[in-house]
Amino acid sequence: AGVDPLVPLRQAMFNYFQVPDRLGILTHLYRIAEGAQQGDPLSRSWELLKEGFLLALTQGR
């Protein structure tokens, strides 16, 4: 089996959210989902969230 290509992606997300693992990121994701369910436009808008995710992916370069 080869190297998992998602390892760098996962690590970038963990670093961005300052969490040690997948379980740590759940708190952030639950908060976003809860806001979206309550109609919060920021939580519902991928366009507004995308910049932060892209930054997290490119910080390690």
Curated annotation (Swiss-Prot):
Pathway: Amino-sugar metabolism; N-acetylneuraminate degradation. The keyword Signal does not apply. One of its GO terms (biological process) is positive regulation of nucleotide-binding oligomerization domain containing 2 signaling pathway. The modification Phosphotyrosine is found at Y30. ATP binds at S45. Transmembrane segments: none annotated. GO terms for molecular function: ATP binding; muramyl dipeptide kinase activity; N-acetylglucosamine kinase activity. Its EC number is 2.7.1.59, 2.7.1.-, 2.7.1.60. It catalyses: N-acetyl-D-glucosamine + ATP = N-acetyl-D-glucosamine 6-phosphate + ADP + H(+); aldehydo-N-acetyl-D-mannosamine + ATP = aldehydo-N-acetyl-D-mannosamine 6-phosphate + ADP + H(+); N-acetyl-D-muramoyl-L-alanyl-D-isoglutamine + ATP = 6-O-phospho-N-acetyl-D-muramoyl-L-alanyl-D-isoglutamine + ADP + H(+). The keyword Kinase applies. Keywords: ATP-binding, Immunity, Innate immunity, Kinase, Nucleotide-binding, Phosphoprotein, Transferase. Converts endogenous N-acetylglucosamine (GlcNAc), a major component of complex carbohydrates, from lysosomal degradation or nutritional sources into GlcNAc 6-phosphate. Also has N-acetylmannosamine (ManNAc) kinase activity. Involved in the N-glycolylneuraminic acid (Neu5Gc) degradation pathway. Also involved in innate immunity by promoting detection of bacterial peptidoglycan by NOD2: acts by catalyzing phosphorylation of muramyl dipeptide (MDP), a fragment of bacterial peptidoglycan, to generate 6-O-phospho-muramyl dipeptide, which acts as a direct ligand for NOD2. Homodimer. Belongs to the eukaryotic-type N-acetylglucosamine kinase family. This is N-acetyl-D-glucosamine kinase. The gene is NAGK.
